[in-house]
């Protein structure tokens, strides 16, 4: 499954079913740029079980505020629309897999 780019309007629909890893990021954020290829690898390896959604906090401040995003990158694991895990900052692939696997 390809990584989905969400907006304030589409975020709820994109995260309402199954296990979703939501990446709150911004184009100017160095650690966000570092985590992008890690998310691509996760998508290739786990895309059949996991949906990855990216949301630009500069363009979608309403959703970032709703979820209390204060620092980026912030990664939320949602299961059927409910937040079950939160991670702030860059994490290696193995740490993200561990974060997600608990909820698959």
UniProtKB/Swiss-Prot annotation:
Protein name: Thioredoxin
Protein encoded by which gene: trxA
CDD domains in alphabetical order: TRX_family (cd02947)
All residue ranges annotated as the Thioredoxin domain in the record: 2-104
GO molecular function, one term: protein-disulfide reductase activity
Family recorded in the similarity comment: Belongs to the thioredoxin family.
GO term, biological process aspect, one: cell redox homeostasis
Disulfide bonds: 29-32
Keyword field contains Electron transport: yes
Top-level taxonomic group: Bacteria
Function, in words: Participates in various redox reactions through the reversible oxidation of its active center dithiol to a disulfide and catalyzes dithiol-disulfide exchange reactions.
PROSITE patterns (alphabetical): THIOREDOXIN_1, THIOREDOXIN_2
Record-level GO cellular component terms: cytoplasm; cytosol
NCBIfam families from the UniProt entry: thioredoxin
Organism, scientific name: Bacillus subtilis (strain 168)
Keywords: Disulfide bond, Electron transport, Redox-active center, Transport
UniProt key word Mitochondrion: no
